[in-house]
Design a protein with these regions (language model features):
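Conserved class I S-adenosyl-L-methionine
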Residues: 2-50, 63, 67, 87, 150-183
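A short glycine-rich, Lys/Arg-flanked "PGG" loop and its adjoining helix->strand segment in the class I
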Residues: 135-147
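C-terminal lobe and adjacent flexible extensions of AdoMet/dcAdoMet transferase-like proteins
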Residues: 213, 217-278
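Class I SAM-dependent methyltransferase SAM/SAH-binding core
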Residues: 55, 62-108
Length: 278
């Protein structure tokens, strides 16, 4: 049985950030709809055409678990934040295609070996600043996957704070400028300011480091791809996104160039896909 969330060894500021944030609504506002649409598209293009056993590690309030269950997959969600698990269970109970949700730690999954066909890690890596913890989470995903199973691993780009600062005017704050410098040099994102817009303790990857970490866990890895791409730097992005024709064109073209290095590095999130060798 998973232990209460304050025993799951996440930094207190991370737990507090998610307890206070509206994680359930995040992918429905701002740049969230683009992140959701692209993540879903990337995953769908790589899933086998059959019902699958899926573990959604760090699955939050169940935004991705919900559509996967609706598509006919059997989904088990794990998250270290008790509030997220309760919201995920409530969301599941209101759906015709339910999924399960429980407290758990990405570094110590409460399942036996070779239990799942697919593992989603769409958040754990960037809230595990220590390399050993990220390695443990990836090895756990490898352990619970069946031979030939697929892992999807999301990371925040090393340049994400810099682009966010340009877009939102945060670079005018010298404290944020120092945060960006630390991100670029070390990948370690720390926010001593108390400003929630500056995010919480995290680790930001380069594409090469993300690929290397997933490979080190025993996966055969595709080149990481951009999730949002460069659109978040566009003035008036929300208005453009609500234009059906513009949105369709952007998503079509981004799919064509999603693995180009410059596009990957310009994206706030990047996604690696790995396969467990049979």
């Amino acid at each position: 049985m998973a232990q209460p969330d304050d025993a799951l060894r996440l930094a207190p500021e991370i737990l507090n950030h998610y307890r206070e944030a509206d994680e359930a609504g995040r992918l429905g506002r701002g740049s969230g709809p683009l992140e959701f649409a692209r993540t879903r598209d990337i995953v769908l293009r790589r899933l086998p055409a059959r019902a699958l056993d899926v573990i959604d590690v760090g699955g939050g309030t169940g935004v991705h678990a919900a559509w996967l269950a609706r598509d006919g997959h059997r989904v088990e969600l794990i998250d270290p934040v008790a509030e997220h698990v309760m919201q995920a269970r409530d969301a599941s109970a209101q759906r015709d295609a339910p999924f399960t949700a429980q407290l758990g730690d990405a570094r110590n999954l409460p399942f036996g070996d070779e239990r799942f066909d697919v593992a989603l890690l769409l958040g754990p890596l960037y809230h595990l600043p220590e390399p050993a913890d990220r390695a443990a989470a990836l090895h756990e995903a490898h352990r619970v996957l069946r031979p030939g199973g697929i892992v999807f691993v999301a990371a925040i780009s090393r340049l994400a704070s810099f682009f966010s600062g340009i877009r939102n005017g945060y670079l005018d704050d010298p404290r944020f400028f120092d945060i960006v410098l630390d991100d670029l040099v070390t990948g370690r994102h720390r926010n001593p300011t108390g400003e929630p817009e500056y995010f919480t303790t995290a680790f930001f990857h380069t594409p090469d480091l993300l690929r290397a970490e997933v490979e080190a866990a025993g996966f055969r890895v595709e080149a990481p791809v951009a999730v949002e791409g460069p659109a978040l730097g566009l003035a008036g992005f929300a208005e453009r996104w609500n234009d059906d024709a513009w949105r369709r064109r952007y998503l079509e073209r981004l799919r064509d160039i999603e693995s180009e290095r410059c596009v990957v590095e310009a994206s706030a999130h990047i996604l690696a896909t790995g396969a467990k060798l049979a």
